[in-house]
Amino acid sequence: MTTHNNKRGKERSRKPSEPGIKVFVDHKKALILGQVGKSLAEKSVSSNMKDWYEEYEIACEQIRHENEQLLDGFVALLRNQRLAPRTIKGHRDNVEFFINEFLLYEDAKRPVDGIGEVDAFMGDWFIRKAMWSTPRTIKSTATSLFKFYAYLAALDRITPAELAALKITIAIDLPDWQARCERYNDGDIEDWRGED
């Protein structure tokens, strides 16, 4: 039986190769592509995601502060209209859920930029995310949002045309939103959106 030895008389094994490809950008620095630790691309994406998230959180905090001031003014308006404290609280809570949860859920949007999102909120997101969603709460939330945007129109934050478009959207889509909510809350119906 013969053994193959290298020049030193020991058997020499090759170190198993690590996954990834080393590309030499210059004669000293290797850029590693693949899955050897964290590649530069992964580090860059990770760093960018962290930076983006921090910026998003800062923007959301700023918007929440602005929203609190808007809500205070909105509540003052409702008090001047001599609404009952319970009604005022309901309107405030409905609007706060829309502006501080929905509009900040995926992106940092201010209420003036979110007026076009009312249909997506009422016809889908609210139904799925609010455990208290019923056809009745759909109607009361739509009323709250219209009152809030009427308040923003009085402050010249949105145009009368935007408010009129919202009024039409609510008038036309409210029955559909309520029907979707009823279907969603019925566990026997799979196509709660009514798309089939």
Label each PLM-derived region with a short phrase.
Residues T2-D196:
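Charge-rich, intrinsically disordered N-terminal extensions
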